[in-house]
Amino acid sequence: MAKKVAVIGAGVSGLISLKCCVDEGLEPTCFERTEDIGGVWRFKENVEDGRASIYQSVITNTSKEMSCFSDFPMPEDFPNFLHNSKLLEYFRIFAKKFDLLKYIQFQTTVLSVRKCPDFSSSGQWKVVTQSNGKEQSAVFDAVMVCSGHHILPHIPLKSFPGIERFKGQYFHSRQYKHPDGFEGKRILVIGMGNSGSDIAVELSKNAAQVFISTRHGTWVMSRISEDGYPWDSVFHTRFRSMLRNVLPRTAVKWMIEQQMNRWFNHENYGLEPQNKYIMKEPVLNDDVPSRLLCGAIKVKSTVKELTETSAIFEDGTVEENIDVIIFATGYSFSFPFLEDSLVKVENNMVSLYKYIFPAHLDKSTLACIGLIQPLGSIFPTAELQARWVTRVFKGLCSLPSERTMMMDIIKRNEKRIDLFGESQSQTLQTNYVDYLDELALEIGAKPDFCSLLFKDPKLAVRLYFGPCNSYQYRLVGPGQWEGARNAIFTQKQRILKPLKTRALKDSSNFSVSFLLKILGLLAVVVAFFCQLQWS
């Protein structure tokens, strides 16, 4: 008899968890509090309690080839970085392809998840839900929590003396939808993460002036990398990941600093991070430098105090006649349907084995999916988490002892602090490729490079030096997909397809030109050595 699994949430993590349950022969039921799938990526004009809310212009910071699910590439005509509506379209295609909607109960809120009396032997859970004012309860063999971590808006008003006197408008960035109504205003955006930067750039087109306050500074990256390819397809390779792991920390940090400053000098723009050697997640924004050059945005230090109409900053400067303050200060998360003894959230931190399993339970039948911030795409990360979790639920994979898991949690947290610092916004941060490989190893889906060097050297080279995308984890092991190898070799075609909207007469001239340059360079070298010999 198939084990019954409750999946809480029908966003990215919930959808892929449903598919993984079905793939493993489990019987899932998904509870989604709203009327549709998509989670944080589904734009709505109104703000809903307990749900993150995006602005209309949001696009992805990770590219389509690095963000698609491992056996379902995005259509080749999709742009590399997707508008939220386009990403939602992909989710709908995915859900239809694998017939996932039939497992979802919409407009159903999970009120509580409690252990059954015989949990120590059965591992079962009693799940109480509410829909249309009626409560229902059911028993499940396992639970996958997929409600995400963009839940409660974090507005630290106590850190801003005088906010109660401020006569203008102030609100959290989740309430911002579009620039209408902010024309001619003097606006202060507090917080320079991705949302704060996006909002500041968008408002600066029609506002009188936009200021952005950053406590520690930040690195700003372009989505466009070497030769015009998406940044993550260049940055996230196993070769580069290996270098970052084996080289001395000082060398790695120096390399990162050089890479970040290659686009523009962050010190000159007042953006250089206070602690350059903490690997804080960079801001992905192609417009910030130009808006700073135009003077449309001005970078400010931490706000020290607010008056009725002005902002006083820690460096002693004052900006008068502020009309609007937008707090782009992130989110905190909680699980109101779980007891603290199950998953305790403290200072925006949770103690979970590999960011997934509570270590202290008698039975490993509760898991959190997507409660992590990788330095890369969340989509393949959540997928590998779900693939592992469903195999644990089915009894095909096992977890180590509680003591071993607790030691891993402590060690992982120490490493996280060392790499990313102790900021509340970095509590879920982790390296990308390393974490994916770690999960893949648990289910036997990590490619064996030594073996591939002999069996398929061309593929081995692609895996090691090319983009580390999700297809790699469908080459071997459970859930092997026969289309994985082809997807790896055709990814460049899908990257370039949406860009080649203008037909060129003949691209062969480029090859000839390149060859002539090489021959010319060789001629110069030969001439140089000949001259040395004659002299």
Swiss-Prot record:
There is a cross-link at K492 (Glycyl lysine isopeptide (Lys-Gly) (interchain with G-Cter in SUMO)). NADP(+) binds at T60, N61, S195, G196, S197, D198. It is a single-pass membrane protein. It is an enzyme of class 1 (oxidoreductase). It comes from Pan troglodytes. Pfam families: FMO-like. The modification N-acetylalanine is found at A2. One of its GO terms (biological process) is toxin metabolic process. Catalyzes the oxidative metabolism of numerous xenobiotics, including mainly therapeutic drugs and insecticides that contain a soft nucleophile, most commonly nitrogen and sulfur and participates to their bioactivation. One of its GO terms (cellular component) is membrane. This is Dimethylaniline monooxygenase [N-oxide-forming] 2. The keyword Endoplasmic reticulum applies. Keywords: Acetylation, Endoplasmic reticulum, FAD, Flavoprotein, Isopeptide bond, Magnesium, Membrane, Microsome, Monooxygenase, NADP, Oxidoreductase, Transmembrane, Transmembrane helix, Ubl conjugation. The keyword Oxidoreductase applies. Its cofactor is FAD; Mg(2+).
